Amino acid sequence: SGSCAVRTCWKQLSSFHETGKLLKLKYETAVRVHSITNDATGETELISPKKHSYTLKNHIPRTTDLVYIEDSPNFCRPSKYSPGTAGRVCSKETNCESMCCGQGYNTQSLLVHRPCHCQV
């Protein structure tokens, strides 16, 4: 008499929440690199900052690190990239503090009259 075993394997994505947490962690620990172009080949290479300026943010990146070449603009202030947060509409209960970059916000109450098109 023999026994049989069936084993089924599959890959499954992490939950959206877990993926978001990991991506945020990678963003917060991203490593700045510089790009140079090899004149002989025309190829661009990414190089880490020099070892003598070593800090937590300036270490040699691993293949799993998120890297960046230049700082992101401050989207809270008006610039060529963004109109800033002035005049932005937000939901007071959920996201005004983050969407207005902690600069405060004004509330406004509106009374709107609309015909109801009721049938009698």
UniProtKB/Swiss-Prot annotation:
Q: Name one GO molecular function term.
A: frizzled binding
| Subcellular location as annotated | Secreted, Extracellular space, Extracellular matrix
Lipidated positions for O-palmitoleoyl serine? 1
Spell out the post-translational modification annotation for this entry. Answer: Palmitoleoylation is required for efficient binding to frizzled receptors. Depalmitoleoylation leads to Wnt signaling pathway inhibition.
Name the GO terms of the biological process aspect: canonical Wnt signaling pathway; cell fate commitment; neuron differentiation
A GO cellular component annotation here is:
extracellular space
Give the InterPro entries listed for this entry.
Wnt
| Entry coiled-coil feature ranges | none
Top-rank taxon, per record: Eukaryota
Key words, A-Z: Developmental protein, Disulfide bond, Extracellular matrix, Lipoprotein, Secreted, Wnt signaling pathway
Report the SS bond pairs: 90-101
Role according to the record = Ligand for members of the frizzled family of seven transmembrane receptors. Probable developmental protein. May be a signaling molecule which affects the development of discrete regions of tissues. Is likely to signal over only few cell diameters.
Which family is it part of?
Belongs to the Wnt family.
Q: What is this protein called?
A: Protein Wnt-9
